[in-house]
Structures are given as structure tokens and as C-alpha cells.
């Protein structure tokens, strides 16, 4: 079975969800412009332009964090 992964930029409407994710990860929420990763519609990871990332510690997210890193590098190169 395949999961749908969606990556998009955070908006003001995502603040609460990102803070909740950071609390789960026991880390500070990424500041400024951030990329978010959703698996099957559920937020599982967030990454700032500076590289600060948080992820759901109860899910396998390494591949999602790698996708966020790749997307961020591509945007910075453009």
C-alpha cells in the first residue's frame, strides 16, 4: 500500500498544528517560512529554510524529512 505525501509551504492557519508537532518532538517549532509534509493528509514533519526540523516521533519520517530537505535545497537554488 502506498501513502500520499504532500509538501507545501506553511500558512498562518498551520501555526497550531506545527506547534503541536513540535511539542510531540520535544523541540522548538520551526520559525519563519517553513515547508510542511503531510502523509495521507496528516502533518508529520516541518522544516524551516534554515534547516530546523521537527517530526512526529511516533511515525517513520526519515524519508519525509529527506524530501523536505531536497525541496528546500531546490527552492534555494532557484
Which residue stretches match the model-derived regions?
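Charged, low-complexity, helix-prone segments enriched in Lys/Glu/Asp/Gln
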Residues: 25-30, 38, 71-72, 77
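Acyl-donor binding region in acyl/amide transferases
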Residues: 49-78
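Short amphipathic alpha-helix that is part of the acyltransferase structural core
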Residues: 1-28
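Conserved beta-hairpin
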Residues: 33-45
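Short acidic, gly/pro-rich beta-turn/loop elements at beta-sheet edges
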Residues: 17-20, 47, 51
Amino acid at each position: 500500500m502506498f501513502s500520499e505525501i504532500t509538501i507545501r509551504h506553511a500558512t498562518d492557519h498551520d501555526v497550531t498544528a506545527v506547534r503541536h508537532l513540535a511539542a510531540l518532538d520535544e523541540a522548538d517549532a520551526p520559525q519563519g517560512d517553513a515547508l510542511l509534509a503531510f502523509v495521507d493528509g496528516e502533518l508529520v514533519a516541518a522544516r524551516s529554510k534554515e534547516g530546523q526540523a521537527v517530526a512526529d516521533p511516533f511515525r517513520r519520517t526519515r524519508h519525509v524529512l529527506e524530501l523536505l530537505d531536497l525541496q528546500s535545497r531546490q527552492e534555494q537554488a532557484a
